[in-house]
């Protein structure tokens, strides 16, 4: 960016990087020249002092990416080059409760390049570029050039354009493909390359009608290059290729021979943005044909089930005036397709015969690429989108869409089979958290995601239960569970008035931009999502125990301090009860894959946590029994019971323990013993590691205390009345 103050006689550079920031527009306030707004490929910046200093464009999610890929780390990273801002590899989940600058790092890919993370080593990221292929290693921070000999242009290397495909074989993790106008293959992780195709672009081309009056001045340019490549997940011998001049070619023998299978309706100058080889048979493929360059703004998606011999255009339901960019097939459900245009994302449940919007809360933006992330490394089922101007977006949990596709949209009340849940901590950062004015992206929800559908409005309450493999109830939710009204997260202004009248009410001691919206089971017709936090049932009458958690606090998403231990990894059953009828589905809970604690230590942790929880629950149940009977007693008997179960303070029942809370002083009571056991359990919940000697000792003390007070209670407890025999 340049500035002149003498009518253009002299100029001074005032802003920009050595590589150029690509400024597009500048606006100067007509009456206050100190105020300047500028926009570039990176975002918008503001100066209030004639350009001496500027605001930060990193306050805006304006990344313009060309493609999107994911790696096999846990949590997985989302990677791409981006327009004039360096490449990106950003975690899809953060241990800090929200995704911040701590969670991303460049991978040294050119701005328009395609990232190809090593499937066997997520610390290594390969990237495509005009000059070839790069290899970035996070451990060393170094980048090597490892592509075919790009110095030898012409016939040997071939032609290329800005976004050259670079993709790993889905059937052989050692095989990597790269393209120019020919396909290159490496079987040794980019150490050596072999050319496996002829020139796959059109041999001739004509001037498109859209050139109009300029047609006579158009001069021949170099022929096209390959812009789409898709190896088959079913056969290592099948590859599909598409070019930026409208060719689609396929090989079924590993590149020995290629066949041009371009649909007749695809015109020259059409850019094949992507091809998706079928996941369920090697003869199927889908293609996104982008016709922007010939002034055709209609979407054009194609499908073949016979090796490309015949093609069907599949656009019904997709809005016009937005060209096709990407199409993907769900790897789990045949016929379930996702598509991206220059405006939004779409979904088809019937192999492209009909489409419906999947935009949801996304802005209207050019979605350049989409990927289905679903494998054993991520323990997920997500749809990842790369946009040209709004960065990355992730749709968490495709299971409801998959169920709709399998059932072809059947109606009724049901529970969607949950995807495997991973026991991760939402946020582990110690206070103070990042303030809300700093840019951050949302973490996915922690816990088990449970989707359910109601065919009609429920006549009564809706109940959701989690049952373990032995049939024991672990957690129970009801649509009648008490919640704060109004919700401080959703209506802070109204709740602030509550706080003015009652400063001691929940959440009134902190700004109301911290709490997360409350969960409540929905009772109206439709598809609903609920989350089990993968913990045991709170002990006490009020499920809203615990204040907003300081550790892991996130603006607008801060959870409450947990008051019960984690449920152990294993198999569970989700049971939904509506109007007396129950619907069940199995649920698997897994440990965080990053945990490497030996099994013996994990078993000890689970056993002690469960034992302490059970002791706390038993002691609290005895306390409730004692308080229920104390009014029927008098004299010494009443005094003895009250010594074990004194009346609770006015605000009880509350949370029985907080992590690290010490056991109360003697004399022990049923409630103090319950708190001691729960405190011993909660002290072990911060990490999936074997309990320390101090933690084991605390469990020993709590066990003895609970057993002692329960024994005293049993001696005092009146025997149950028996009916007299008549």
Model-inferred region functions:
Residues 1-438, 445-448, 482, 486-500:
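Beta-propeller blade termini and top-face loops
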Residues 134-135, 450-451, 458-476, 571-575:
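Beta-strand-rich binding/interaction modules
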Residues 399-426, 584-618:
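Low-complexity, Pro/Ser/Thr- and charge-rich linker/hinge segments at domain boundaries
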Residues 428-463, 467, 525-531, 609, ...:
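Contiguous beta-strand segments within globular domains
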Residues 473-565:
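Glycine-centered tight-turn motifs at strand-turn-strand junctions
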Residues 511, 544, 592, 603-645:
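Preference for long, solvent-exposed alpha-helical segments and helix-linker "stalks"
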Residues 538-542, 577-585:
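Short acidic/polar inter-strand loop motif in beta-rich domains
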Residues 587, 620-726:
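Mature extracytoplasmic or organellar-lumen-exposed domains after removal of signal/transit peptides
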């Amino acid at each position: 960016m340049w500035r002149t103050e003498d009518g253009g006689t002299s100029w001074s550079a005032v802003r920009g990087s050595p590589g150029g920031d690509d400024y597009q527009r500048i606006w100067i306030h007509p009456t206050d020249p100190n105020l300047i707004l500028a926009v570039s490929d990176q975002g918008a910046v503001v100066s209030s002092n004639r350009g001496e200093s500027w605001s930060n464009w990193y306050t805006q999610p304006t990344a313009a990416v060309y493609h999107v890929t994911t790696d096999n780390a846990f949590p997985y990273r989302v990677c791409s080059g981006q327009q004039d801002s360096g490449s990106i590899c950003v975690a899809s989940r953060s241990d800090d409760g929200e995704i911040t600058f701590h969670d991303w790092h460049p991978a040294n890919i050119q701005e328009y390049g395609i990232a190809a993370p090593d499937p066997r080593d997520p610390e290594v990221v390969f990237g495509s570029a005009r000059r070839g292929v790069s290899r970035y290693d996070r451990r060393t921070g170094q980048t090597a050039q490892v592509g075919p000999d790009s110095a030898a242009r012409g016939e040997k290397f071939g032609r290329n354009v800005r976004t050259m495909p670079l993709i790993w074989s889905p059937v052989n993790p050692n095989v990597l493909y790269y393209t120019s106008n020919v396909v290159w293959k490496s079987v040794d992780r980019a150490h050596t390359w072999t050319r496996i195709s002829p020139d796959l672009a059109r041999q001739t081309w004509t001037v498109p009608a859209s050139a109009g009056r300029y047609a006579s001045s158009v001069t021949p340019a170099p022929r096209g290059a390959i812009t789409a490549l898709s190896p088959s997940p079913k056969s290592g011998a099948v590859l599909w290729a598409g070019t930026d001049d409208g060719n689609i070619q396929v090989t079924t023998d590993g590149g020995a021979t290629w066949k041009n299978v371009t649909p007749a309706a695809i015109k020259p100058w059409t850019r094949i943005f992507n091809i998706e080889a079928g996941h369920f048979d090697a003869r199927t493929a889908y293609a996104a044909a982008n016709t922007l360059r010939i002034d055709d703004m209609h979407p054009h998606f194609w499908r073949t089930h016979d090796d490309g011999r015949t093609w069907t255009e599949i656009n019904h339901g997709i809005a016009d005036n937005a060209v096709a960019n990407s199409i993907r097939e769900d790897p789990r459900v045949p016929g379930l397709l996702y598509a991206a245009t220059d405006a939004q994302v779409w979904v088809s449940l019937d192999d492209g015969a009909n489409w419906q919007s999947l935009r949801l809360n996304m802005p209207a933006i050019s979605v350049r690429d989409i990927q289905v992330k679903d494998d054993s490394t991520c323990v997920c089922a997500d749809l990842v989108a790369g946009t040209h101007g709004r960065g990355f977006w992730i749709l968490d949990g495709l299971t409801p869409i998959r169920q709709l596709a399998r059932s072809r949209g059947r109606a009724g009340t049901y529970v969607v089979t949950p995807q495997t849940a991973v026991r991760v901590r939402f946020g582990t950062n110690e206070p103070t958290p990042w303030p809300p004015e700093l840019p951050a992206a949302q973490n996915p929800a922690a816990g088990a995601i449970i989707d359910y559908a109601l065919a009609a409005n429920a006549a009564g309450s809706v109940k959701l239960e989690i049952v373990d493999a032995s049939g024991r109830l672990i957690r129970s939710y009801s649509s009648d569970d008490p919640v704060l009204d109004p919700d401080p997260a959703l209506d802070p202004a109204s709740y602030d008035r509550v706080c003015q009248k009652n400063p001691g009410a929940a959440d009134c001691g902190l700004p109301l931009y911290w709490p997360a919206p409350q969960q409540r089971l929905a009772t109206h017709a439709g598809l609903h999502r609920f989350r089990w936090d993968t913990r045991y049932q709170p002990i006490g009458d009020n499920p809203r125990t615990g204040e907003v958690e300081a550790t892991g606090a996130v603006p607008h998403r801060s959870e409450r301090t947990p008051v019960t231990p984690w449920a152990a990894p294993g198999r569970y059953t989700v049971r939904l009860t509506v109007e007396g009828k129950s619907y069940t589905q199995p649920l698997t809970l897994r440990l965080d894959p990053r945990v490497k604690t030996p099994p013996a230590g994990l078993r000890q942790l689970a056993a002690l946590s469960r034992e302490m929880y059970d002791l706390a629950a038993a002691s609290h149940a005895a306390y409730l029994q004692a308080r229920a009977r104390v009014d029927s007693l008098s004299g010494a008997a009443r005094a003895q019971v009250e010594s074990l179960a004194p009346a609770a303070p006015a605000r009880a029942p509350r949370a029985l323990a907080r992590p690290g809370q010490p056991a109360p002083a003697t004399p022990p009571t049923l409630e103090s013993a319950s708190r001691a056991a729960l405190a011993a359990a909660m002290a072990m919940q911060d990490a999936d590691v074997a309990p320390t000697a101090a933690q084991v000792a605390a469990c020993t003390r709590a066990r003895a205390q609970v057993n002692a007070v329960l024994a005293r209670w049993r001696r005092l407890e009146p025997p149950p009345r028996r009916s007299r025999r008549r």
